[in-house]
């Protein structure tokens, strides 16, 4: 009987240790209405510009891969090595963006070459993405509206958001790319 109690306690201890290890290993940012900007976070216009520029670069650099996948892999290292501060300062949405991209190099860090540059073809910028048609029933729409109006969702954001991840917490280029 003593051996079964010891084995049960050992099993419980191992199970608890594994659960704690998994919990610590997952980084989940939570934000409340009292959250403040992280010292190294991007907020407001800088966050919007960095997001727009990164998504623009990823869609046009990898048109066959990026629009179909939300997950990211190692093929995007060149774009991911561009610092967020550079992405926040670029304005790729100007009317003369084609001339800007074809004449200027966007600086990025390469492991082999150090600071370098990349040119992107302007023909890829002409492609338009088609939005999928939304098919919703009335009950689904009511459920969405009910969730949007709930006080609980305002107080603690249950799902991660761009502002929570990149303004109230420190953000990486990889994290920002998951919102493209």
UniProtKB/Swiss-Prot annotation:
Gene3D superfamilies: Insulin-like. Belongs to the insulin family. One of its GO terms (molecular function) is hormone activity. InterPro entries: Insulin-like, Insulin-like_sf, Insulin-rel_pep, Insulin_CS. Residues 1-25 form the signal peptide. It comes from Lymnaea stagnalis (Great pond snail). This is Molluscan insulin-related peptide 7. Residues 71-152 form a propeptide. GO terms for cellular component: extracellular region; transport vesicle. Heterodimer of a B chain and an A chain linked by two disulfide bonds. Disulfide bonds join 43-167, 55-180, 166-171. Keywords: Cleavage on pair of basic residues, Cytoplasmic vesicle, Disulfide bond, Pyrrolidone carboxylic acid, Signal. The modification Pyrrolidone carboxylic acid is found at residue 26. It is found in: Cytoplasmic vesicle, Secretory vesicle.
């Amino acid at each position: 009987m003593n051996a079964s109690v010891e084995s049960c306690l050992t099993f419980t201890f191992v199970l608890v240790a594994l659960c704690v290890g998994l919990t610590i290993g997952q980084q989940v940012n939570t934000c409340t209405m009292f959250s403040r900007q992280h010292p190294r976070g991007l907020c407001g216009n800088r966050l919007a510009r960095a997001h727009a520029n990164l998504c623009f670069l990823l869609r046009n650099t990898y048109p066959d891969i990026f629009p179909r996948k939300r997950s990211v892999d190692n093929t995007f290292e060149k774009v991911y090595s561009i610092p967020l501060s550079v992405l926040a300062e670029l304005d790729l949405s100007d009317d003369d963006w084609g001339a800007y991209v074809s004449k200027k190099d966007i600086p990025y860090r390469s492991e082999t070459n150090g600071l370098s540059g990349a040119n992107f073809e302007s023909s890829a910028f002409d492609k338009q993405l088609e939005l999928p048609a939304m098919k919703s029933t009335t009950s689904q729409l009511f459920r969405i509206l009910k969730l949007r109006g709930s006080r609980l969702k305002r107080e603690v954001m249950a799902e991660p958001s761009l502002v929570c991840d990149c303004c109230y917490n420190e953000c990486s280029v990889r994290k920002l790319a998951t919102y493209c």
